[in-house]
Design a protein with these regions (language model features):
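Conserved phosphoryl-transfer catalytic core
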Residues: 51, 60-75
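Amphipathic alpha-helical segments used for helix-helix packing
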Residues: 87-91, 102-133, 173-178
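Hydrophobic/aromatic residues within well-ordered alpha-helical segments
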Residues: 49, 56, 60, 64, ...
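Helix-turn-helix
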Residues: 9, 17, 21-59
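C-terminal peripheral helix-coil segments that are non-catalytic and often amphipathic
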Residues: 87, 98, 102, 133-223
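Short alpha-helical scaffolding segments that buttress acidic/His motifs in well-ordered protein cores
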Residues: 92, 96, 111-118, 162, ...
Length: 223
């Protein structure tokens, strides 16, 4: 098998196995068997299981981040250089939600791998998430342009909470379905996106809670 085909076969088999069984339960020997290659080929191309996981995650994350930045660029062009805050949040979380949610039969191995990466915290993925933040800096800058009078710290929290809502929805989708007895439709990705964007915008732009210090909020809620 040519070298590039061997590499592709390993990546494809690993992605499928990790998506289906999780990171801890899949061994390099499982991947070797599924890819129909020898262990030396995995060691030659990737060096270790962690490096293999890292390459898969980087490849898929780069595709998502490109889509995010393309949507952000379009929103800023539409706004004459200053995107509306709702359009910024939509570009931030939309690609992830559309890639990971929806009917099961529409989910590719790539999408299921990214869902697994969101559910399971493993060292190579944590390291990449903590290191690769340049695209998020661009979103933070867009938020500052959109809301120039807003405290920068609040904008960072707003960005963080929007991402947290999206990832929590992906991680615990089955629990939400059970809790709501099926009334919350996780196949309605557009509706989920609208809800996350709406809450994110509200947190930054509206209401008494935005202006009141945390200590005063606690005192008020205790009454």
């Amino acid at each position: 098998m040519p070298t590039d085909h061997t590499r592709t076969a390993i990546l494809s088999a690993a992605e499928r196995l990790y998506a289906d069984r999780g990171f801890a339960d899949v061994t390099l020997r499982d991947i070797v068997a599924a890819a129909d290659v020898n262990l030396a080929a995995v060691n030659y191309h990737f060096g270790s299981k962690d490096e293999l996981i890292a390459e898969l995650f980087v490849t898929r994350s780069m595709a998502t981040n490109r889509q995010r930045l393309n949507e952000l660029k379009a929103a800023e062009l539409a706004g004459g250089g200053r995107a509306a805050i709702d359009a910024i949040f939509r570009a931030l979380v939309g690609p992830t939600l559309r890639g990971c949610l929806g009917p099961d039969n529409e989910r590719s191995a790539a999408a299921r791998f990214m869902i697994r990466a969101s559910i399971e915290s493993v060292p190579p993925i944590r390291r990449i998430k903590n290191r690769e933040i340049d695209h998020l800096r661009k979103f933070a800058a867009a938020m500052r342009r959109s809301l120039p009078g807003r405290d920068q710290v609040e904008l960072y929290w707003g960005l963080h909470f929007a991402l947290a809502m999206a990832h929590q929805t992906i991680r615990d989708s089955e629990r939400l379905i059970k809790l709501s007895e099926g009334s919350c439709d996780l196949n309605d990705v557009a509706g989920i996106l609208d809800r996350i964007v709406s809450v994110s915008v509200m947190a930054l732009t509206g209401g008494e809670a935005e202006k009141m210090p945390p200590a005063k909020l606690a005192a008020r809620d205790a009454r």
